[in-house]
């Protein structure tokens, strides 16, 4: 194996380029059932030096972290200690890639790598100071953007479905509720049908295992077409179905559930469930 990898390296190393076009080709090369490449980059200033962080990923089906069929590669020229680099990634993955679910199915194959070469020549980030915080914020932007690209490009998807839980008693409660909603097949099908089916959302919250009072829940739908309240204190309000359908017809839709128990929040990302998801996976042969 090592000899084979060495041969591949010798053949491919001369082809390496530091151009945007080469990066895009790399993002395309790792695609499987993805319909589009997924990449993003950002620059920040650290110690008077410009630091670049860039990332690419692939994933479309069997997406339900912790383990899922996804690959993520993030690189930076920042000078940062190995310990803090690992800690920054480990913490950020919890709120980004691990909050994505396309179909609720896991896999034994997933990787997220964060590599730093120090070529920005900034003063080494070796403590949790302002520079470290700035780096973590940029890393979160990269990982959040890539996570949403995975969710929005789920197999057969026509819409990105975001779920925000607010007013939770704890972070754990918010995470559990948001992931239960975003994974619900009935809710995902309703999103595809542009149907403000609040009953399916409350149902998913109910079987999540998290404790909450359904009679206190407020529920909203939001997209670039507007925002509408569907439930107040667990009871449907007199909303316009036409307006709700308009809001739910966009290619990115957010459900916001306020459980009124505290100040904690969580956001999960998924997609609608379509006929094409069935077709893609019914036609697949191993």
Locate predicted features.
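Single conserved hydrophobic/aromatic residue that forms the stacking wall/gate
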Residues: 1-9
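Short glycine-rich or small-residue beta-strand-to-loop segments that form or flank ligand, phosphate
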Residues: 3, 54-56, 71-76, 112-117, ...
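Contiguous domain-boundary segments centered on the initiation and propagation of an alpha-helix
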Residues: 12-46
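Flexible, glycine/charged-enriched surface loops at secondary-structure junctions
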Residues: 20-27, 41, 97-109, 145-162, ...
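Mobile "lid/hinge" segments at catalytic clefts and subdomain interfaces of large enzymes
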Residues: 61-121
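A short beta-alpha structural unit
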Residues: 112-114, 158-170, 198-208
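A glycine- and small/hydrophobic-rich beta-loop-beta segment
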Residues: 118-193
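Internal helix-turn-beta structural module
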Residues: 175-176, 183, 187-286
């Amino acid at each position: 194996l090592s000899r084979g990898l060495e041969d591949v390296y010798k053949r491919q190393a001369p082809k390496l380029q530091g151009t945007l076009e080469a990066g895009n080709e790399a993002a395309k090369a790792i695609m499987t059932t993805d319909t589009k490449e997924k990449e993003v980059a950002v620059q920040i200033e650290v110690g008077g030096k410009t630091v670049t962080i860039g990332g690419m990923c692939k994933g479309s089906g069997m997406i339900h972290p912790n383990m899922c069929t996804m690959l993520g590669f993030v690189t930076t020229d920042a000078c940062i200690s190995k310990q803090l680099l690992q800690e920054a990634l480990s913490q950020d993955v919890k709120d980004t890639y691990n909050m994505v679910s396309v179909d609720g199915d896991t896999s034994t194959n997933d990787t997220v790598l964060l590599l730093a070469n120090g070529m920005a020549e900034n003063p080494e980030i070796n403590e949790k100071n302002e520079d470290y915080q700035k780096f973590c914020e940029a890393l979160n932007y990269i990982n959040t953007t890539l996570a949403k690209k995975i969710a929005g490009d789920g197999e057969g998807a026509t819409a990105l479905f975001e779920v925000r839980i607010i007013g939770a008693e704890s972070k754990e409660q918010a995470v559990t509720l948001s992931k239960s909603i975003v994974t619900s097949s009935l809710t995902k099908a309703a999103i595809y049908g542009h149907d403000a089916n609040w009953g399916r959302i409350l149902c998913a919250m109910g079987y999540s295992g998290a404790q909450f009072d359904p009679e206190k829940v407020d529920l909203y739908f939001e997209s670039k077409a507007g925002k509408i309240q569907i439930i107040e204190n667990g009871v449907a309000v007199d909303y316009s179905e036409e307006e709700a359908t308009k809001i739910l017809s966009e290619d990115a839709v957010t459900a916001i559930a306020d459980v009124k128990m505290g100040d904690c929040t969580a956001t999960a990302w998924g997609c609608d469930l379509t006929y094409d998801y069935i077709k893609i996976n019914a036609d697949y042969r191993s």
